[in-house]
Amino acid sequence: MSSKNFHKYRKMQDKFDLPQLNELKRTFKFDLEENEKIFDQIRNEISERIFTFTEKIIEPVIAGSDSYSCIFEQEMLSDKERQKLFDIYKKIQVLKWENNLLMLQPDEKKAAEWVKKTWELWNNEIEGELSKVCRKLSNSWDTLKFMSEHNNYNG
């Protein structure tokens, strides 16, 4: 990353109380390209990962899908756990549409605010809750047993 981009981020970091760039890169596993607008690139990298979680983890569990696993996974979570996931889902959808608006109408200040808001939501809610769900589903699959019922027709 160019020193120009780094200094630009540092300036915005101080102004908007943004997370350390290295923390963002490590958490969301991305590298920055030299010639890109730094906030657009950071926003795009973060949004790609968060929205992937939505599509691969949250949506199938709360809404179902055509996959065989969803039939079981929906039953592995309680109504309360599914409601928590839906509440997170709504917050991520807000981020998604704010992100879409920033793609249509780029604004560096709003992009910086979006990064901060997303970072806080990730650390305060998303990561912890999704980790719990992943652990629970993994454990549930590990202990899942088919019940064999033999129905005898006595008619």
Residue ranges and their predicted role:
Residues S2-G155:
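Long, low-complexity or tandemly repetitive, helically biased scaffold regions used
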